[in-house]
From Swiss-Prot:
F-type ATPases have 2 components, CF(1) - the catalytic core - and CF(0) - the membrane proton channel. CF(1) has five subunits: alpha(3), beta(3), gamma(1), delta(1), epsilon(1). CF(0) has three main subunits: a(1), b(2) and c(9-12). The alpha and beta chains form an alternating ring which encloses part of the gamma chain. CF(1) is attached to CF(0) by a central stalk formed by the gamma and epsilon chains, while a peripheral stalk is formed by the delta and b chains. This is ATP synthase subunit alpha. ATP binds at G169, D170, R171, Q172, T173, G174, K175, T176. InterPro entries: ATP_synth_asu-like_sf, ATP_synth_asu_C, ATP_synth_asu_C_sf, ATP_synth_F1_a_nt-bd_dom, ATP_synth_F1_asu, ATPase_a/bsu_AS, ATPase_F1/V1/A1_a/bsu_N, ATPase_F1/V1/A1_a/bsu_N_sf.
Length: 500
């Protein structure tokens, strides 16, 4: 092989000419210790709180403890591949998730990555998981109703768009059923729903997704899932990721309903992380800032002013109590942050009153101004009659000889309890709710036996819809409907066949 010196020199000159010296400057650190989803990283002097850190093998972490020489980071994923001495890079970005229309109908994890096997998500925008809540000037008071389709809630504990309403109760009292029914009831109402599952079983989430699919609700719903088998940091970050996805729609003038199921598990995950990061424990071993954990999340739900597009984000956080103890640390924290609570009582649930809403200690602090006129008219009387019945029922257990008035009130109360019962995944239109509540408070059901009431109710809806559709229009339009509805109920009662 004959090599000419001039050829070699021309090749070398060409190489030198084309050489570009690219120097990439990144702030790096090295792993000192790792375990239980927590890494101590030496270096990274300029790291920000909440910054995304890159570990080897495309594993990411989040800087939480910023000390003089060491950064305490939580690992968002599997920490088994990370070892002592590994190089950690700063990304210069706060943890962010994909947002926008592309996520609707999908099931994603806490970082917005798809886990439903339907391929990648074609998103064009991301948002930081932590962002500042709208200020006082940016908000307007809640005035539009958000119908749940559940009679006891829409009448006595109404929810408005932009409200935060806590759902609280022991395990297995129907908390998730209420929020699923609320999501199903948003069909055709131009509301985007986000369901954030924290610390739940995968089988439960699979069941829930199939319920939403059957009801056609997945077309306007995003499911964010951080299951019980995932690390504490992913369970901690899931609600903030869901809120970021919702904010994108809210700031674009749309209406969002977001469910956090449930925040007690998020608090437990945060406690685990904080103790591993050696933060000082407080009451029930929770860190001192556990109130701020939930307040900064729930303050992001708002009804925006018209100048900002008038969008809204309604939050339904769920808290699980132990043996009905609503005065524990986390329940009292969240009760004080939210605009009211729906308390589900195990005794009611087991006695067959489902949904097991206890109107005695349930309250909606701002929802009353969001009720439609017709519902406001009938709901006040209903709540009063129901609470009087509860009092009388407890008292009448001790007395055998009751006067006629007391017997009448007890009979009416029994019928109120009966009409407030509702099957799972069977939301009822607000105009139909008004009809049956009007019937019971005006004693139109006093001669109908208790075991016939459910049938009477469903047949009444069909009768009015088929023969007097204008009544529904009047109820929704805020016109006077009482005479027409009374006549329709009386006509229907004549045709109704009581089954013994």
């Amino acid at each position: 092989m004959n090599l000419k010196p001039e050829e070699i020199s021309s090749i070398i000159k060409q190489q030198i000419k084309n050489y570009e010296n690219k120097v990439e400057l990144t702030d790096t650190g090295s792993v000192l210790t790792v375990g239980d989803g927590i890494a101590s990283v030496y270096g990274l002097e300029k790291a920000m709180s909440g910054e995304l850190l890159e570990f080897p093998g495309e594993i990411y972490g989040m800087a939480l403890n910023l000390e003089e020489e060491v950064v305490g980071a939580v690992i968002l994923g599997d920490d088994s591949e990370i070892k002592e001495g590994d190089i950690v890079k700063r990304t210069g970005r706060i943890v962010e998730v994909p947002v926008g229309e592309a996520l609707i109908g999908r099931v994603v994890n806490s970082l917005g990555q798809p886990i439903d096997g339907k391929g990648p998500i074609a998103y064009t925008k991301t948002r930081p998981v932590e962002s500042e809540a709208p200020g006082i000037i940016d908000r307007r008071s809640v005035y539009e109703p958000l119908q749940t389709g559940i009679k006891s809630i829409d009448s006595m504990i109404p929810i408005g768009r932009g409200q935060r309403e806590l759902i609280i109760g022991d395990r297995q009292t129907g908390k998730t059923s209420i929020v699923i029914d609320t999501i199903l009831n948003q069909k055709g109402k131009d509301v985007i729903c986000i369901y954030v599952a924290i610390g739940q079983k995968r089988s439960t989430i699979a069941q829930l997704v199939s319920s939403l699919e059957k009801g056609g609700a997945l077309d306007y719903t995003i499911v964010v899932s951080a299951t019980a088998s995932e690390s504490a940091p992913l369970q901690y970050i899931a609600p903030y990721a869901g809120a970021a996805m919702g904010e994108e729609f809210m700031y674009n003038g749309k209406h969002v309903l977001i469910v956090y199921d449930d925040l007690s598990k998020q608090a437990v995950a945060y406690r685990e992380m904080s103790l591993l990061l050696r933060r000082p424990p407080g009451r029930e071993a929770y860190p001192g800032d556990v109130f701020y954990l939930h307040s900064r999340l729930l303050e992001r739900a708002a009804k925006l002013s018209d100048e900002l597009g008038g969008g809204s984000m309604t939050a339904l956080p769920i808290i699980e109590t132990q043996a009905g103890d609503v005065s524990a640390y986390i329940p009292t924290n969240v009760i004080s942050i939210t605009d009211g609570q729906i308390y589900l009582q195990p005794e009611l649930f087991y006695s067959g009153v489902r949904p097991a809403v206890d109107p005695g200690i349930s309250v909606s602090r701002v929802g009353g101004s969001a009720q439609i006129k017709a519902m406001k008219k009938v709901a006040g009387t209903l709540k009063l009659a129901y609470s009087q019945y509860r009092e009388l029922a407890a008292f009448s257990q001790f007395g055998s000889d009751l006067d006629e008035d007391t017997k009448k009130r007890l009979a009416q109360g029994e019928r109120i309890v009966e009409i407030l019962k509702q099957g799972e995944h069977q939301p009822i239109k607000v105009e139909n709710q008004v009809m049956i509540i009007y019937a019971v408070i005006n004693n139109h059901l006093e001669d109908i036996p208790i075991d016939n009431i459910a049938r009477f109710e469903s047949e009444l809806y069909a009768f009015v819809d088929n023969n007097y559709p204008e009544i529904s229009r009047k109820i929704l339009g805020g016109e006077d409907f009482t005479h027409d509805l009374t006549d329709a109920i009386n006509e229907f009662k004549e045709k109704f066949v009581v089954e013994v």
